Amino acid sequence: MRLNKYKDPLPLLVHSPNCRRYRSWQLLLGLLLLWPELCGGVNMQQFIQSLDMMRNGCMVKFKVPIEILNRIRDGDFDMEPNQDLLCYTKCVAQLAGVLTKKGEFSVSKAFAQVPIILPPELQTPAKNALTHCKEAQNAHKDTCAKVFYISKCMADFDRAHFKFP
């Protein structure tokens, strides 16, 4: 493919095999713009919008029925999870920036993200739930299961303040 130096190369990029990579960067940029560090966090409306964006980004990768996603959004993790549901929760954690390079859930990264991605009214309850549930992942070897069960623990600890994409 030869580029004419006077034409905009962006349309060629969008229709090229690298399009998925380009769209992934667009999604990442969009998520970063929703979490303004300099503004001191987000309000509840922005937080709910970011949950929707994370859900949309992860639900296309895993076959989890929308009914199940709606249940876990409000903290109902009382189900026998399949591998898709386990890895959906890991995908969300990855988008939230709380995984290590090895794909493990990091409690310290989660604490660091709390003031950035949560509205003020959810920050203290989230920190309390993280403190209570930090050991919940230790009983599991699979990284997807670790994230699912720490999320379940946090939901069970304080369902009134728990929200999940």
Show which residues each predicted segment covers.
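PEST-like, low-complexity acidic/proline-rich intrinsically disordered segments
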Residues: 1-8
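Mature extracellular/luminal domains of secreted and GPI-anchored eukaryotic proteins, especially small
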Residues: 30-165
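Cleavable N-terminal signal peptides of Sec/SRP-targeted secreted and luminal proteins
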Residues: 8-17, 21-41
